[in-house]
Design a protein with these regions (language model features):
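Glycine-rich oxoanion-binding loops at beta->alpha junctions
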Residues: 129-149, 174-175, 180-210
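Active-site phosphate/pyrophosphate-binding segments
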Residues: 228, 235-355
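Glycine/threonine-rich flexible loop motifs
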Residues: 222-229
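Extended, charge-enriched "interface" segments that sit outside catalytic cores
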Residues: 13-21, 28-29, 33-41, 45-152
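Conserved phosphate/anionic-ligand binding catalytic regions in large, soluble enzymes, centered on
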Residues: 159-173, 281-288
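Conserved beta-strand elements of the Class I
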Residues: 158-160, 212, 344
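A glycine- and small-aliphatic-rich helix-loop capping segment at beta-alpha/alpha-beta transitions
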Residues: 169-184, 205-207, 229-237, 264-270
Length: 357
């Protein structure tokens, strides 16, 4: 599902309000905006099939949106008028489409095959991505196989991910949705709330000797994350009484090597983040280390291949049969023309009813 998209004249693309394609949609809305869903199905009994699409293993039925064939045609015309295909190509190329921060938005590179080349600032970032994946896999398989030993020589049985926002929500969602694939001899917990109760509850039944913490913070200065990380460190040290134990029970995902080293985490246990990955799109980067530990390297890479399949669909499918594009265009129609400003996401599958939905 796509979030609601409100467009105003103050936005950088607000000039589209004066475009002929936008005005055509306004005129179209004046004729069809009051139609009831019953009327739409009565006029086109086959709309349940006509307004449906399958791609990358997903089936989208958008027939219950208040649209007809002309609505769809006009929305696609609007997308073309705005240069969506060109903007899509720019994103995949690594152009600086994140205009507020003057950065690329290359989360798609995180699931690109090793054979691909994407050059950013003179560097093939795909090489960096796969080097990080291989390091993640090495750690994950050691933990899963009992080769990663804690300070006292015991194997790790508990993994606690400490993060907030995109460093928490994606991993939580992925773990809960895929928990049937997770290792039976490991427990996964997630701590994001600065309220100390969150960490207390997560560690209540855990043994420090068997617990590994993953601290996810690009700057290693995020208040909530570092508050919880230091509390976890203190919890661990109460058992060991030895600062050297931190190196066996904490790993980090960060770009701040100095702060991580000061915390006591070994440089070899620090995984990279990149400015060209937004937090909300980071679950397939090292932020997903907890997911990889839970489900294993093979399943994690299968997850990446699934994402890649949808990337390729988005990149190449005609706009009228392009699932992400259609969801975005329907959001524009529902919000800006029908006045539907709230989007409900109602998963029927219990595994998808995470706190992040």
């Amino acid at each position: 599902m796509s979030a609601a998209v409100a467009i105003t004249a103050a936005d950088p693309i607000g000039d589209l309000l004066s475009r002929g394609t936008w005005k055509a949609l306004l005129e179209h809305h004046a004729h069809v905006g009051g139609q009831h869903m019953r009327e739409l199905f009565a006029a086109d009994p086959e709309r349940g099939t006509r307004f449906a699409l399958e791609a990358a293993g997903l089936y989208l039925d958008y027939s219950k949106n208040r649209i007809n064939a002309e609505t769809l045609r006009l929305l696609v015309a609007l997308a073309l008028d705005c240069g969506l295909p060109e903007r899509t190509a720019a994103m995949f190329r690594g152009d600086l489409i994140n205009r507020s921060e003057q950065r690329a938005a290359l989360h798609t590179a995180l699931r690109a095959p090793a054979s691909e080349r994407i050059i950013l600032d003179g560097v093939n970032i795909i090489t960096q991505v796969h080097a990080a994946l291989d390091r993640m896999a090495e750690l994950a398989e050691k933990v899963r196989g009992g080769q990663w030993l804690g300070h006292t020589g015991k194997r790790i049985r508990n993994v606690v991910n400490i993060g907030i926002g995109g460093s928490d929500l994606g991993p939580v969602m992925a773990y809960e949705a895929l928990r049937h694939y997770s290792a039976a001899n490991l427990t996964l917990s997630f701590v994001s709330n600065v309220d100390g109760t969150d960490l207390i509850e997560a560690t209540r039944d855990l043994e420090p000797e068997e617990t590994l913490f993953i601290v996810c913070s690009k700057s290693f200065a995020t208040l909530e994350t570092l508050t919880n990380a230091h509390a976890a460190r203190a919890w661990s040290l109460r058992k060991f009484g030895d600062e050297r134990s931190v190196a066996r029970h904490f790993v980090a995902v960060s770009t701040n090597a100095d702060a991580v080293a000061k915390f006591g985490i070994a440089p070899s246990n620090v995984f990279p983040m990149w400015d060209w990955v937004g937090g909300r799109y980071s679950m397939d980067s090292a932020i997903g280390l907890s997911t990889m530990i839970a489900i294993g390297d093979a399943h994690f890479r299968e997850l990446l291949r699934g994402m890649r399949t949808m990337d390729e669909h988005f990149r190449s499918a005609p706009l009228a049969r392009n699932m992400p594009t259609l969801l975005g265009l329907l959001s524009v129609w529902n919000n800006n023309f029908l006045g539907a400003t709230t989007l409900a996401v109602l998963p029927y599958c219990l595994l998808y009813t995470s706190r992040c939905v």
